[in-house]
Structures are given as structure tokens and as C-alpha cells.
Amino acid sequence: TQKIVIDAENEVEQGGHVIEDEEETKRSSANKPEWKRYYHLVVIAKNQVGLGNLFTLVKKSYKHGFYRFPRIDYKMLKEHSEGLIVSTACVGGLASGLIYRQFSGLRFDELRPDLMNSLDDYNPVMSRLENMADQFVDCVGRDNFFLELQFNDLSAQHLTNRCLIDLSTKTGIPLIATADSHFPTSDKWQARELYKKLGWMGAKLDQSMLPKKEELKCMLYPKNAAQMWDEFKQGHNQYDFYHGSEELVRDAIERTHDITWQKCEDTWIDTSVKLPHFGTPEKSAFRMLSDLVKEAMIREGLAVKPVYVERMKEEMSDIKYLGYEAYFLAMYKIFHLAENRTLFGPGRGSGAGSLVNYLLGITQIDPLPYGLLWSRFLGRHRTSWPDIDTDAGDRDALIDASRELFGDDAVIPVSNFNTLKLKSLVKDIAKFYGINFTEVNKMTGPLQDEVMPHAKDENQEKSVFVLKHEDCMKYSKGYREFMEKYPEVGKHVETLFMENRSIGRHAGGVIIAPPEDLESTCLLYTSPSPRDGLLS
């Protein structure tokens, strides 16, 4: 097991999950800043119950709260608050939004701590923050709500810090200190900027569009306690309001560590197989399957042939021993309902070696005349679930049949993550730097043939081969010379290789499970329509 600390904030560019005033959102215009329309919230699972509630909140934020962005509200949070810890997040959080609202006539870079010197501004801001704190305490309890300090070069962040320090002093709500993390280490800032630009490759882009280090507003990467203290000291030297708050900040840094290692228990993701429920008090799932198989044996005239009877008994005995009757019933019902809507292939692979599959109409091949073995498909010696391979002319007909049988909430299409593979990544980075396409293509074309035989032999790889930068540097002279000629390309390839590029819908993958089991799984929806749902 491992400790899982999940941040529902994500990055500013990716939206995130929000606490939002829906009425204000509906009245807002396109000209209003983002921080006036939705807010981030950090939610941490401190135990297994909390992890399930966090997954439920994510699911509901997409399925029931989607309005431009996935959202939750106080009521939803309170209903699923057990086992959760909440903090106020970064400058995109609700606390910051309530502060900045007071200065709506200013640009973001004009927000600074000394704006709170005026009581005409200070009092209404603190009143809003106290009301916000009361609502969060009501949702998750006083021991599970924290005010979040961050230390960076944004003057608006120091404005937020000033208000939250005062709020903590007044209410006793504890502070924590965190670091927004948009890239892994301080030297990876340029790779992140390039990563963002790669999503816009349709536009005319070149390396001049990458900012210089001194142009960055802040360096957002994970920091240890000593680095956090150094960041605070820089702010301490710049802003007077930090004077006298040293002990508060030191405690906040230590408290962040304590939350992870003392308040959060070990949690795990349940990866066990969940099948739809079959059977009734009068008839078990295995009895249902047995009746279907016996009826088919009689219908096909096989019940009088001893070799078929023995094979049927062997297979049914193994199925009962392994507890797989629900799997075969589910496959039977899906195929039976969809058979008039689409064409099926005869079946292929080891599944064609099952007489039960043939009798249920899942495959169209009688395995006995061809000597096909049941043991290659299933047996008591096998620890993995059976895998039936067949072809269907209409994928959606199968999915629709599954929805009719088990319900929309029990049939969820699967998402997949598109990653930055080596050859396409090299081409994209080279394009960004204006390197001639012919030169790049000449180098990348033969890479697979040059590298794969050597790399697979050295690494003893038997799985699908994936080109890696280090293997290409070792076994491809053309690749090595290209990287020596254009070192900036190689530098970014090492950092960005296999990073997620986008999320999409798997071409055919579908999860079928009881809705009550899916409740504990993190569900993401791109739209309220179940057909468009994505499971993560």
C-alpha cells in the first residue's frame, strides 16, 4: 500500500474542480477574470472512506455539476465529507477570489498586500473570509479545514497570505504551507513552457515565444521544508506584514508534513474484478448458467453423445470452482440481445476452445471436431480471468445492448491517455525550433529498424517495443549526430518523453460493473450524457 494524497486543484490551465457561486457564474460576462467565475479547492483523502468520497465528488462534479467546468458546491461537499481534508488552494482558490473581488477594478498584477491597509477594504474582505471558513468548517469539521499559504513572486499571493494569516489569528483555524507545482524541478521550467506550446502546433510558433527565465512570474515546483522557509524569508524581507509571523509560518510548514504522515492513513485502489449480479433467491447464477447449457445440449442433439457430456461437465465444474458463472452469463446476455443488431465473427483465440461458449452462442465453432483444448482457455490452474476474442460489425450495438441489460450507470466507456512518443515528440520539438522537416524525417524514418533488434536483445524485452531516447542514442548513429547538432531538442526530449498529451475515449474499451461498485471508482465525464462518459 501507499499513501495517496490527491489534489483536486490540478493546474490553472486545466480548470480543476471548483466551489462556485452558480448565480454569479450565470450572470458573468466573458470579460470577467477567471478567478471571479470559478475557484479551485484542494481535497485530500485521509483514509479509505475519504478516497471513496473523493472519487464520488469527482464523479458528481462532472455528471451533475458541470457548467463549463466540473464543479462541486458546499452541499455536495458536506454530503461526502467523511475522511476528507480541505484547504483553500492557491491564488485560484475561493479565499483568494473573495479577497480579489474587493479590488475588481485592478489587474491581477496590480494586487498587492498594502491594499489591505484601508479598513474600508480590510473589513469586508475579512467578513467574507470568515463566512467562507464557517461554511467549510460546517462541511468537513474544524479539524479537517486548513488555510493555505504559498510563497512565490506573485504580489497577489502575498495579499492572500496577509489575509489568511489574519484570519488564522482571529479564528484559530490552522495554516499550512504548500508549493504550487507545475514542473518537477527548478531547471525544468522551459520544458513545461514548451509542453504548453506543443498543444498549439497548428499556429505559427518558434523558439522566440518561449519566455526567458527572468520573465517568469514565479517558479512553481515542489519544495522541501528548507526551501519553503527560504521562500518565506524572501517575502519577509519584502513585506512588513510578515514580521512577527515567523512562528506561525514555521508551524504551517511542519503541519503540512504532519498531515501527510500523521493524519493520512495508507489507502489503496480496489482493482478486484466486479461483475454484474445474477441469480435470485430461487435460482443461483450457476443454476441459471447450467440450465442454459443443458437446453443448448438438447437443442443441438449433443446430450446423447458421451464425449460432449463429459466435456460439458468438465467445463462447468471448472467454472463453478473458479466462480466465473456471472462472467459467462453476462457475455451470453449481451450477445443474445445484440445478435439481431449486428453481425458477429465465429470467434478466435483460446475462447474458441470452449464448448460452453459454443453452446451459449458466444462463439460459432464446435471445439471438439477440431481438437481445441478447454485448458488453453480456462482451467483451475489459471489465475487470470478468461478472455473471449470475437469480432462485431457494430461496436455501438454491443454497448447499447449492454446498457439495456445493466443500466447506463453500470456501463462506462474507458478513457485513454495519449502520450508523447519519441518520434512524434522529436518532430514536434524540431518543428518548434524551425529545423528542416526533411532532415528530421530522414533521421527518424529508420529509427525503429536500427534500434529495435539491439535494444530488445539487450533489455530482454518481450512486450511491445517502445523507442526510448537512451536506446536511440546508443544504437542509432543518425539520431546521435542529430542530437549533437541540436542539443536543445535532446534536452527537451529527455524531459517530455511519455508525458500525457491528451485524454480521449478508448476505441472499444468498456467497463461493466454494478453501479454500487463503480461509486468507489474515480469517474470523469466530458459531458452529462452517459454515452460520452469517460472512466479514469
Question: Which sequence ranges carry the predicted segments?
Answer:
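Alpha-helical scaffold/interaction cores of sigma-54-like transcription cofactors
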Residues: T1-S527, R531, S536
